[in-house]
Curated annotation (Swiss-Prot):
V-ATPase is a heteromultimeric enzyme made up of two complexes: the ATP-hydrolytic V1 complex and the proton translocation V0 complex. The V1 complex consists of three catalytic AB heterodimers that form a heterohexamer, three peripheral stalks each consisting of EG heterodimers, one central rotor including subunits D and F, and the regulatory subunits C and H. The proton translocation complex V0 consists of the proton transport subunit a, a ring of proteolipid subunits c9c'', rotary subunit d, subunits e and f, and the accessory subunits VhaAC45 and ATP6AP2. Belongs to the ATPase alpha/beta chains family. HAMAP family: ATP_synth_B_arch. This is V-type proton ATPase subunit B. It comes from Drosophila melanogaster. InterPro entries: ATP-synt_VA_C, ATPase_a/bsu_AS, ATPase_F1/V1/A1_a/bsu_N, ATPase_F1/V1/A1_a/bsu_nucl-bd, ATPase_V1-cplx_bsu, P-loop_NTPase, V-ATPase_su_B/beta. SUPFAM superfamilies: P-loop containing nucleoside triphosphate hydrolases. It comes from the Eukaryota. Disruption phenotype: RNAi-mediated knockdown in the wing results in planar cell polarity (PCP) defects including misorientation of hairs, multiple wing hairs and defective venation.
């Protein structure tokens, strides 16, 4: 397609969505309150309508109608309200909702939090303009996620297996290496390659990453961009960056723009998309700021009462759809304020998502990477993504036994601090030995170490051989007979 044809297609796409009503312009700003602009004497304002605000110096900002009361309209300005002059600001009501241009050309590009290119490249030639709230997916047409994604990280693959189409957050805290873990998952993620069985859609053309950053510092944005460039996957990555010095309110639309792009890539281009959203805590704080400006009744810790619903509108945009080959797997990252898992943000997130990966400060302080604490971590869809034909028949039993031994080992460690090592039984000493080796050999691994799920399971068996057969009560006798002997090579 040459440039002229492309331009013609672009014009057709725009005119297809053209709203025929005349656009009305007002100069009736009656007040500015935080990120909100209040307009009077507006004829038929519509909820969620997009408004273009032209400032006295000629700059144009966009906003969205949040509230309508008679002829009054409350507009949330995405780029912030600094410099808006009540007398000289022109407000044009577009009569349309917020749509974003989408195209396969978005891969390899960098956008700001409002979806404008910031990589000095040309604007996107839109294949379509999609509503950023997403298409409602009929629950009946959703497919249960059943293909395991191999991340190459033992603590995730064996203990908290992720299925393609799952939403699973990383619960972290300030100063912990959650970005490194997310980058490692992006680098290494792929389907499990079973011996003697080829994976049809495993080729890299079929895989895309959509990365949305909200309120992150320049260092984090640079880290991810550099990591994608270094491992050669940048042409399959679409970045949306709202940095810490960008407007707070923009953070409310950034994840929605990213997910709209992901839905297009997954359901129209049939790609398998991995969506990384960081940092959801910044998003929730932006939500609180808007809520406070609207003088709504606050909920827990000042967050709005509808935060649960709002977070669900983001997290639920993951999964698989009948008749389409693509999928969306979501890994939101959130930093728990003061390492508090009962804080409203991680608390509500845990209710919506299908498990969580818990990054632990104590493990990090002991120089263990990745510091994933497997006890509070969970993957609710693991049971259907593992087992014979998908990974290996001993997978769930090994996982259960490792959990049990690690939990008992933690109890023994706490007891040892009280009564001393001399008072422990021989069995207790075995659990202590297991605890140390589990953290050192199983959880701990290199930044670029990509273990297959079979290698990880074999490491698990090496650790379980610390115990005599009789103590491994979670594993059936048939599995023990096959895998427990030292000379078994599977």
């Amino acid at each position: 397609m040459n440039a002229q044809q492309a331009q013609r297609e672009h014009v057709l796409a725009v005119s297809r969505d053209f709203i025929s009503q005349p656009r009305l312009t007002y100069k009736t700003v009656s007040g500015v309150n935080g990120p909100l602009v209040i307009l009077d004497e507006v004829k038929f304002p519509k909820f969620a309508e997009i408004v273009q605000l032209r400032l006295a110096d000629g700059t144009v900002r966009s906003g969205q109608v949040l509230e309508v009361s008679g002829s009054k309209a409350v507009v949330q300005v995405f780029e912030g309200t600094s410099g808006i002059d009540a007398k000289n600001t022109l407000c044009e009501f577009t009569g349309d909702i917020l749509r974003t241009p989408v195209s396969e050309d978005m891969l390899g590009r960098v956008f700001n939090g409002s979806g404008k290119p910031i990589d000095k490249g040309p604007p996107i030639l839109a294949e379509d303009f999609l509503d950023i709230q997403g298409q409602p997916i009929n629950p009946w047409s959703r497919i249960y996620p059943e293909e395991m994604i191999q991340t190459g990280i033992s603590a995730i693959d064996v203990m908290n297996s992720i299925a393609r189409g799952q939403k699973i957050p990383i619960f972290s805290a300030a100063g912990l290496p959650h970005n490194e873990i997310a980058a490692q998952i992006c680098r290494q993620a792929g389907l499990v390659k079973l011996p003697g069985k080829s994976v049809l859609d495993d080729h890299t053309d079929n895989f895309a990453i959509v990365f949305a950053a909200m309120g992150v510092n320049m260092e984090t944005a640079r880290f991810f961009k550099q990591d994608f460039e270094e491992n050669g996957s940048m042409e399959n990555v679409c970045l949306f960056l709202n940095l810490a010095n960008d407007p707070t309110i923009e953070r409310i639309i950034t994840p929605r723009l990213a997910l709209t792009a992901a839905e297009f890539l997954a359901y129209q281009c049939e790609k398998h998309v991995l969506v990384i959203l960081t940092d959801m805590s910044s998003y929730a704080e932006a939500l609180r700021e808007v809520s406070a400006a609207r003088e709504e009744v606050p909920g827990r810790r000042g967050f709005p009462g509808y935060m649960y619903t709002d977070l669900a509108t983001i997290y639920e945009r993951a999964g698989r759809v009948e008749g389409r080959n693509g999928s969306i797997t979501q890994i939101p990252i959130l930093t728990m304020p003061n390492d508090d898992i009962t804080h409203p943000i991680p608390d509500l997130t845990g209710y919506i998502t299908e498990g969580q990966i818990y990054v632990d400060r104590q493990l990090h302080n002991r120089q263990i990477y990745p510091p994933v604490n497997v006890l509070p971590s969970l993957s609710r869809l693991m049971k259907s993504a593992i087992g014979e034909g998908m990974t290996r028949k001993d997978h769930s039993d090994v996982s259960n036994q490792l959990y049990a031994c690690y939990a008992i080992g933690k109890d023994v460690q706490a007891m040892k601090a009280v009564v001393g090592e001399e008072a422990l039984t021989p069995d207790d000493l075995l659990y202590l030995e297991f605890l140390t080796k589990f953290e050192k050999n199983f959880i701990s691994q290199g930044n670029y170490e990509n273990r297959t799920v079979f290698e990880s399971l074999d490491i698990g068996w090496q650790l379980l051989r610390i115990f005599p057969k009789e103590m491994l009560k979670r594993i059936p006798a048939s599995i023990l007979a096959e895998f427990y002997p030292r000379d078994s090579r599977h």
